[in-house]
């Protein structure tokens, strides 16, 4: 996860204990580990690579908040990411934004995710991204790309923390606090058992 604000409810729900603090905070119990990588692609890529190299997980789940680029996605609802688009990383030959396909579990509402290093606060900017993706974050693509490089399965679940009507930092932080407990409970009850069916899985 990117921030302690998002991770706190997971740490509480799963009763995780701090395992290490550097180079990234890592918490664990007897089934899962959670790493707080920081905001943005570079931080997420470094944290994911470190985590895979150190623990060799069977799979990784990138979870946390994402903004809705339109009114189709409901504030507080959770979506499973089926495709990731990077508007700020065009293919060098075609100029088309790079796309990635993460691993997917059946039975969950799906969404396309846009990942870029700059937050989406401008209304026009959000409208442009909505033509490609329904949700937007700053980490998902980097996590999935590193997992792909290391041949580690990657799943992404995001809850909606802001919509075109909720664009101030104060509103986003308020909504993350408001919905993070519901998100962590949903993940632990509905998602984690699916990931743990055959073997332990790393968060």
Where are these regions (language model features)?
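N-terminal beta1-alpha1 ligand-phosphate binding loop
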Residues: 1-19
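Glycine-rich phosphate- or other oxyanion-binding loops that anchor nucleotides, phosphorylated ligands
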Residues: 23-203
